[in-house]
A protein has these predicted regions:
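Active-site acid/base region of carbohydrate-active enzymes
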Residues: 37, 134, 280-309, 315, ...
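C-terminal capping/lid segments that line or modulate ligand- or cofactor-binding pockets
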Residues: 80, 149-150, 329-330, 348, ...
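Heptad-repeat amphipathic alpha-helical coiled-coil interaction surface used
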Residues: 404, 475, 479-482, 494, ...
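Compact, charge-rich alpha-helical regulatory domains located at protein termini
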Residues: 731-804
Length: 805
């Protein structure tokens, strides 16, 4: 019997107290947990440095407990105090103004303090009725709404506790705790509205700390926000989340820090009768304590900032669960976001145990509530989340396989195989129910969520046919589950899934690809999925069709959550390197660098979370810290920088950078379970190209040299390898008579030559209603007046002199 304690239900944010004597103690170990979340102190000193313990999972399945060595905190007479806040267990949680008390409505805790004395004897102090309880000065402790703390409060009496057994299964954590990552100092702003605002210079997740300068009874209110509007404080995008810290001072000089909440923010509005000093305030950045494994940079400052933004969004949203956003009244473990970003996350940090726990969350939801299927988000709040549908529910397939490829842990793959198998079997049964055509599904899916080719500007559903997306992800689920079965020696499963995947592919081809090789759908995401999953008769023909689609879109991306994470990978794999660079490095809306030029320090939820005039979009759903679109960094790491894992656990990698002169240098170092991989490349001033590769002990690499005049590639073993040559392509002089006019317009030097040499054609190209910018210089024989075509004569030769910096 595990004996927990609780007190009168009217006591909000209670403190549980145990006093005891201890002499000549050799070692003291505290095992402890609490629901919702707890903070423990022994003799006035904090126990451990974890935040938001015990963390978030489905508490009906298990409750995690933490273990701390508290020997150094012991005195002769001791007082252990444990304060509880609502957390995920009791607090407001869910979409919009979500309900409270998903798992319970009573605070409770369990603890066991094991004392080993110098004479070898032992004593165990457990939660029982010898403990006392009292009210705390924490008046509100909500994950969404923040914390209200009154340090003038003194509990009038101590209350008895009730010992009971709630029947919870206690379990040691498998994932790392939430810790402080770093700390940020703000600058002080006075807005046009007269508001006092702290700017931390970086959007992040965490809590606020300040040095208390207030006299007794004085209040300070700190409210958080992500962006300014018109230079003034703004927080409407948080929806119903108050996200604030209200503090009433006891007049004691000390550090004051929130303990039972977290916020996603960059700016803090300060309401206080007294003047403040920015140096008294600190932004405490919180994230699951994952080892950073990636070091990389390029010669392109905005691309470097994009990679850093993706990292900050991962830090902000990896708080025990991979959430979608850290700021508004949501903060849920959305499965679609998680699967899209998983590969990128595993590059950035050691995510194995973090994802192990999330796969446990998925498995609990799958078996308890969804009969083999998977939810939109996990934990699912006791099955109240809807079915995830294609792409989202496929987190149960993509994440286990991604984790296996990065870490090569066959035991973990075996542990997660039932998750993969049962979800795949649900898809197969759905297929059978619909006649086993392998194509048409009639269930909900978010599709290409937030794509820009929907029915209207505010549409959340993209233009790619949902049945096609469902069919493609059905194919992927069967294929990857078959691969997992093959790895695990489950031959019967493997053979069945391999045959079925071939049948599904054939059915999808019959439905969506003509005999002549044309795709029946004409969206960017449709081409991405077809090329990614081998749905073509002729790959080059399908790639050419995608190129034409991009051209009709003026090389602006239109993809959403399904297509965008894969877009650049597909383009680069299909040899559409110019197109990939053009989209990635575009500074115009929509695009990744557009966000940065509009002040982004994390990845946005929507391409237009901020409009071009700086206003927050009127879509009613705008998070400025959403990592899903940060998955583009995977293409940067694996294709542009050129370091790609091709066998489980990084035993073999492919080094095949896709190079253009817009990026002159690249360097990446990746710590893996097999050692540290390094690759760096550079375009010299004379146009020569150099590549260096460092292969860890016991590993091999397949090296493909970009634009080598002899199409050189080779396999190499451990050690250092260096290559230098003059490439067949002139990376530094990209313009000639075949140049794309859009590329010319985006290069200031080339655009100036264009304007001087062909002023009329230049003006037409800059006309937003003209399609000239989507043409190449050698394609002006149609759709352009003859007089303007003549202006282009000799322009290509002049443009050859333009050299990329």
């Amino acid at each position: 019997m595990m004996q927990w304690i609780r007190t009168d239900s009217s006591v909000q944010q209670p403190v549980f107290i145990r006093r005891f004597s201890a002499h000549c103690v050799l070692r003291a170990v505290l095992e402890i947990t609490g629901l919702g979340i707890y903070r423990a102190e022994l003799n006035g000193k904090r126990v451990g440095n974890d935040y938001l313990t015990p963390g978030w999972n489905d508490y009906d399945a298990y409750v995690r407990f933490q273990t701390y060595d508290v020997t150094a905190l012991l005195e002769t007479e001791n007082e252990l105090r444990v304060t509880l806040g609502e957390g995920w267990y009791m607090g407001r949680l869910g979409m919009s103004s979500g309900p409270m008390h998903h798992w319970g409505d009573r605070f409770m805790m369990w603890a066991r303090l094991s004392l080993t004395y110098q004479d070898g004897t032992e004593q165990v102090i457990e939660t029982d009725e010898d403990w006392k309880a009292c009210a705390s000065g924490i008046l509100m402790a909500s994950l969404y709404d923040g914390e209200h703390r009154d340090d003038t409060f003194k509990a009038s009496e101590e209350l008895p506790v009730e010992a009971f057994d709630p029947g919870y299964c206690l379990k040691k954590p498998v994932s790392p705790p939430i810790h402080i990552v770093t700390e940020l100092k703000p600058t002080l702003l006075t807005t046009p509205a007269g508001e006092t605002v702290l700017d931390f210079g970086q959007n992040f997740s965490g809590v606020l700390r300040f040095e208390n300068f207030l006299p007794f009874g004085e209040k300070i209110l700190l409210q958080t926000g992500e962006v300014l509007q018109g230079g003034c404080f703004y927080r409407e995008n948080l929806l119903t989340a108050k996200s604030e810290f209200l503090y009433v001072s006891d007049g004691v000089r000390k550090s004051v820090e929130e303990a039972f909440t977290f916020h996603g923010f960059r700016y803090v509005k300060v309401t206080c009768r007294l003047d403040i000093r920015p140096e008294d305030f600190t932004g405490v950045v919180l994230s699951s304590d994952l080892k950073e494994t990636l070091r990389c940079e390029t010669s392109h400052p905005l691309l470097n900032r994009l990679m850093e933004n993706a990292r900050w969004s991962r830090l902000s949203n990896f708080l025990d669960v991979p959430t979608d956003c850290p700021q508004r009244d949501e903060r849920l473990g959305w499965t679609g976001d998680a699967q899209a970003f998983a590969d990128t996350a595993c590059f950035q940090a050691d995510c194995k145990d973090f994802y192990r726990k999330y796969m446990e969350d998925l498995r609990i939801d799958q078996t308890r509530y969804y009969h083999g299927d998977l939810p939109m988000f996990s934990p699912s709040l006791r099955g109240t989340a809807g079915i995830g549908g294609a792409v989202w529910a496929d987190a149960g397939i993509v994440i286990p396989w991604t984790v296996y490829m990065h870490y090569g842990d066959e035991a973990l793959l075996r542990e997660s195989y039932p998750l993969m198998r049962d979800y795949t079997e649900v898809r197969i049964q759905k297929d059978r129910d619909l006649g086993f055509t392998h194509v048409l599904f009639d269930e909900f899916t978010f599709g290409d969520w937030l794509a820009l080719d929907g029915l209207s500007r505010k549409s959340v559903f993209g233009g790619t046919e949902e049945c096609f997306i469902q069919g493609v992800y059905y194919l992927q689920a069967v294929e990857l589950t078959g691969k997992a079965a093959r790895v695990l020696g489950k031959t019967e499963d493997a053979e069945r899934y391999e045959q079925l995947s071939a049948d599904i592919r054939n059915s999808l081809m019959q439905e969506y690809v003509t005999d002549g090789g044309r795709l029946a759908l004409d969206t960017q995401t449709a081409y991405v999925l077809a090329l990614q999953h081998g749905l073509y008769h002729d790959r080059q023909k399908m790639a050419d069709a995608m190129k034409r689609r991009l051209r009709r879109d003026f090389y602006a991306l239109r993809c959403g959550f399904t297509g965008a994470p894969l877009l650049l990978n597909v383009l680069l794999d299909c040899g559409l390197v110019d197109e990939a660079y053009r989209i990635l490095l575009s500074e115009e809306y929509p695009g990744w660098l557009y966000e940065i030029l509009h002040g982004a320090t994390t990845i946005w939820e929507r391409w237009n979370s901020l409009e071009e005039d700086g206003r927050v979009s009127d879509t009613g759903m705008d998070s400025f810290n959403h990592y899903a679109y940060g998955a583009v960094c995977n293409a940067v790491y694996t294709r542009i920088m050129g370091l790609r894992c091709v066998s489980p656990g990084w035993k073999k990698a492919e080094i095949a950078p896709k190079v253009r002169g817009a990026i002159r240098r690249s360097r990446i170092e990746q710590e893996t379970v097999s050692g540290t991989w390094k690759t760096a490349w550079e375009i010299a001033d004379d146009g020569s190209f150099s590549l260096s590769v460092s292969v860890p002990h016991g590993c091999t690499a397949h090296v493909v040299l970009p634009d080598h005049p002899e199409a050189f590639e080779e396999d190499v073993g451990e050690g250092e390898h260096r290559y230098q040559y003059m490439p067949a392509r002139d990376y530094l002089h990209p313009f000639d008579e075949h140049a794309l006019i859009l590329d010319i317009m985006r290069n200031p030097q080339a655009d100036a030559i264009f304007a001087e040499h062909a002023p009329g054609l230049h003006a037409l190209a800059w006309d937003p209603d003209s399609d000239v910018r989507a043409k190449h210089l050698d394609e002006l024989s149609w759709g352009v007046p003859r007089a303007l075509r003549a202006q282009a004569d000799g322009l290509g030769e002049k443009l050859r002199k333009v050299e990329l910096a």
